[in-house]
From Swiss-Prot:
Keyword Hydrolase: yes
Protein name: Alpha-glucosidase
Family assignment from sequence similarity: Belongs to the glycosyl hydrolase 31 family.
Active site (catalytic residues): 320, 323, 416
Disulfide bonds: none
Keywords: Cytoplasm, Glycosidase, Hydrolase
Leading EC class: hydrolase
Cell location: Cytoplasm
A Pfam family the protein falls into: Glyco_hydro_31_2nd
BP GO annotations: carbohydrate metabolic process
InterPro entries, sorted: Gal_mutarotase_sf_dom, GH31_Enzymes, Glyco_hydro_31_AS, Glyco_hydro_31_C, Glyco_hydro_31_N_dom, Glyco_hydro_31_TIM, Glyco_hydro_b, Glycoside_hydrolase_SF
Length: 693
């Protein structure tokens, strides 16, 4: 029986069984031995050989949320979940596992939230009331382990403490939340600039362009294809002239080639097998070796490569295939299957590293299976350091895979989804699951990635438009499509659908100051940008059943239409809600019908900064804008912590407002534009306050 020790600090309890060697060290500051016992924490521990099993009771009305990227309902009860990063192309609902492993779940019992985080990057299994109806059973395939119990009482309290432990999210630049376009793949380089010109001519604001693997020379990392991209500096300059950023894909496989500089400089820094030989696999470049990102010297080397690449003017890095994926065994299996008289689908063949791969972590040799899920975390860490080495103030990294702590370095997107009405709904569940697991900067491939090779796809224009609408407030907003898919860039759509997408994209830009203010809050406190309704109303059991609406911060409720219908019923939680489109104020705990294509409701007690220095104020509250200006509203006054420029002020009120007085001096008349909506055109700097009369 291994020894069990419990430490505590500020509502976080660290349970240490034996002498664990965690994939990443999360030191508990000022930890002290706790007087609490396991039973007082509500836990039972069973040690079976090389496994540790942790059990907690599960009440009938208890809710279990979190666990990251899972293709299931957000209330995780009555299912079993595996933490094991895989290349899950063309995944569907209830497929598990997927690309990201976040071994954190949050229990909400009698309105009180408690978090449970297991710091293991091996294949941890969470059984949430499936095998035994009244238990959560966590099986860790290690004889020593550490985990944390995190007290709330609110869900946001748990996430604040969890991200204090694992790291607060980085703050990306504002452009990273703009509209991005991507394709597998855009080339040659003249076509890239031509596409941007077409988009801008048609009135679409493009924040960034992504280049997939075809920009490389023979798929070798940190190279440009000599014919497709003969003048990369010219390409970058042309995009920057148009205020468009360039983001390039960077996989993890280094081609075995004695004339290839990264292969030569990386010798001694690649993954090995148990015999001490190099692990040689197969990836896009062909015969491939893989950086052992667990080694500090490897991360330094990789940071140097990234820094050199960025020095050309590249603005962002897109990390793909980093579960990590290797094609060796898939190729071997495919060769066997091809010799058989029966045909098999091979799109989900084994693409993981073999069992005999080893890594070197903090000077210790460890098996791949023990740390697999943390591989993308260390890759993102090294890539982030590359930005720092290049003295970049603006950092943009997008990663497909991740582990606890990935929020410190990267955005996450949900991988290779398949366009369908079922997937449309699933994407919301996936991004919300990540959001409430400490990963605030998330998104999906708008339009669905997979192309015509998949019979299940739906290429209807209505579905494509609703993908754009679904993701309206997702932190990461990018269209992306496979080589054999339809064009998802709106300029190639019929005029009717093109204009619909334009309205959606422009609305996103209108709300971008609010979204970016929430990004600042995420970086400071660990709060999600978008969140399920139950995050704000955790003591209301009805909210745990709502999976087709989401909150954007505390103040905005969005109910995308995720069916073929043109209207929908919207569940409004308790409180008062303002219909953004017609000014109606509605009492909550109600269900209303929305006929607008983009149902948006503002919660009483909200301040929403909009593009063009506009503000919407509804009720009494306070809010910190992305520029750190504190805005506080009461029944008859709006105060500002410092001087800011306001072009237009929209006041939502059931009581009439006739005029405002700026800084006790300038009187401005107010126009009623629709019910409960009063607009003042200010167009000046405000030093201190606005009075409402």
């Amino acid at each position: 029986m291994q020894t069990i020790k419990i430490y505590e600090n500020k509502g976080v309890y660290k349970v240490v069984i034996g002498e664990p060697f965690p994939p990443i060290e999360f030191p508990l500051e000022q930890k002290i031995s706790s007087n609490k016992s396991l039973s007082e924490l509500g836990l039972t521990i069973v040690q079976q050989g090389n496994k540790v099993i942790v059990e907690k009771s599960l009440d009938l009305k208890e809710h279990i949320i979190g666990l990251g990227e899972k293709a299931f309902e957000l209330d995780r009860k009555r299912k079993r979940y595996v933490m094991y990063n895989v290349d899950a192309g063309a995944y569907k609902k209830y497929q598990d596992p997927l690309y990201v492993s976040i071994p954190l779940f949050i229990s909400v019992k009698d309105g009180v939230a408690t978090g449970y985080f297991f710091n293991s990057a091996s294949k941890v299994i969470f059984d949430v009331g499936l095998e035994e109806y009244d238990k959560v059973i966590v099986t860790i395939p290690e004889d020593s382990v550490e985990f944390y119990v995190i007290e709330g009482p609110r869900i946001e309290d748990v996430l604040e403490k969890y991200t204090e432990l694992t790291g607060k999210p980085f703050l990306p630049p504002m452009w990273a939340f703009g509209y991005m376009i991507s394709r597998y793949s855009y080339y040659p380089q003249d076509k890239v600039v031509e596409l941007v010109d077409i988009m801008q001519k048609e009135g679409f604001r493009v924040a960034g362009v992504f280049l997939d693997i075809h920009y490389m020379d023979s798929y070798k990392l940190f190279t440009w294809h000599p014919y497709r991209f003969p003048e990369p500096k010219k390409l970058i300059d042309e995009l920057h002239k148009r205020n468009v950023k360039l983001i390039t894909i960077v996989d993890h496989g280094i081609r075995v080639d004695q004339n290839y500089s990264p292969f030569l400089s990386g010798m001694g820094k690649f993954c090995e097998i148990e015999s001490g030989e190099l692990f040689v696999g197969k990836m896009w470049p062909g015969t491939t070796v893989y950086p052992d990102f667990f080694r500090e010297d490897t991360r330094e080397w990789w940071a140097g490569l990234i820094s050199e690449w960025l020095s050309q003017g590249v603005d962002g890095i897109w990390l793909d295939m980093n579960e990590p994926t290797d094609f060796s065994r898939a190729i071997e299996i495919r060769d066997v299957l091809s010799s058989l008289p029966v045909q098999f689908r091979d799109d989900r063949l084994v693409t993981t590293f073999p069992d005999n791969v080893v890594h070197y972590l903090r000077g210790k040799r460890v098996k791949h299976e023990k740390v697999r899920n943390a591989y993308p975390l260390y890759e993102a860490m090294a890539t982030f350091k590359g930005f720092r080495t290049s003295h970049r103030n603006e950092i943009f990294i997008l990663s497909r895979a991740g582990y606890a702590g990935i929020q410190r370095y990267a955005f996450i997107w949900t991988g290779d989804n398949t366009p369908s009405w079922d997937d449309l709904k699933l994407q919301l569940q996936l991004v919300l699951g990540l959001s409430i697991s400490g990963v605030p900067f998330v998104g999906c491939d708008i339009g669905g990635f997979q192309g015509r090779n998949f019979a299940e796809i739906d290429n209807s224009m209505d579905l494509l438009v609703k993908y754009y609408a679904l993701a309206l407030f997702f932190p990461f907003y990018r269209s992306h499509k496979a080589t054999d898919g339809i064009d998802t860039e709106p300029v190639f759509l019929p005029d009717y659908y093109k204009e619909k997408v334009k309205e959606i994209v422009e609305l996103r830009y209108k709300f971008l100051p609010y979204i970016y203010s929430l990004a600042l809050e995420a970086s400071e406190k660990g709060h999600p940008v978008i969140r399920p309704l139950f995050y704000e109303f955790q003591d209301d059991d009805d909210m745990y059943r709502i999976e087709d609406e989401y909150m954007v911060g505390k103040y905005l409720l969005y109910a995308p239409i995720v069916s073929k219908e043109e209207s929908r019923l919207v569940t409004l939680p308790r409180g008062k809600w303002y219909n953004y489109w017609n000014g109606e104020i509605i009492n909550g705990k109600s269900v209303v019908k929305s006929t607008h294509e983009l149902p948006i409701y503002l919660r009483e007690g909200s301040i929403i900064p909009l593009e063009g220095d506009e503000l919407i104020v509804y009720g009494e509250t306070s809010f910190k804008r992305y520029d750190n200006a504190e805005i506080t509203s009461s029944s008859n006054e709006i105060k500002f912590s410092r001087e800011i420029y306001v072009s237009k002020l929209t006041i939502t009120s059931e009581k009439p407002v006739s005029k405002i007085i700026v800084d006790d001096s300038k009187e401005i008349q107010v126009e009623k534009t629709m019910q409960n909506t009063y607009v003042a055109k200010i167009n000046q700097k405000i030093r201190g306050k606005i009075n409402l009369e």
